[in-house]
Regions:
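Cysteine-dependent hydrolase recognition
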Residues: 1-182
Length: 182
């Protein structure tokens, strides 16, 4: 099985950095339409703010798939298998997968374990025995309905900050945690 079945515009800079003499496609229409999938723990798929997030992504031009965790699987391995299958079965498989839920609690989504900590990166390795991801993976870590409202509202407020100049979208500050912190 070849992943991804269609070339992704979102992965272009990744390809350019990893592949010697990489040639991007000459026509944008040759790329698959951008797609994102949210796998939702608990009842998060019906939450009004999750619905608003889906509507925003659609306005941005994404094909959006909203999948309840009960459909994707109840273990990390079953969710990974689900993702491997959709890469083949969907005409436009997701390039980005967002997990909506914490690693435990009423909105939980299972996780993999690396060392003594939880990790989701394993979900992105869908083909072969390498450490090259076939999808981008992320998690909106929430334990309650109010967590969903707060985090999605912050995300939408940030992304829709039309009152800001272009600098708002071109600069970032990130916080990291050293791996030895546990």
């Amino acid at each position: 099985i070849i992943f991804p079945p269609k070339r992704s515009k979102l992965f272009e800079s990744f390809y350019e950095d990893l592949i010697v003499d990489y040639e991007p496609l000459s026509n944008r229409d040759e790329y698959q339409p951008s797609a994102i999938m949210y796998i939702c723990g608990g009842a998060s798929s019906s939450h009004p703010y999750v619905q608003e997030l889906v509507e925003w992504r659609e306005k941005q031009g994404y094909i959006v798939y909203l999948i309840p965790e009960s459909e994707a699987g109840s273990s990390a391995n079953s969710i990974k298998s689900f993702l491997q299958n959709i890469m083949v079965d969907f005409d436009n498989p997701p390039e980005i997968v967002g997990l909506i839920g914490d690693t435990s609690g009423s909105y939980s989504i299972p996780h993999f374990t690396y060392g003594s900590g939880a990790t989701d990166v394993e979900y992105s390795y869908l083909s072969g025995n390498d450490f090259l991801p076939e999808i981008f993976i992320g998690r909106i870590s929430v334990n309650s309905s109010s967590d969903i409202a707060n985090l999605v509202n912050k995300t939408l407020t940030y992304e829709k900050a039309a009152h800001q100049g272009n600098w708002w979208f071109e600069r970032a500050a990130l916080v990291g945690d050293p791996s030895d912190s546990g």
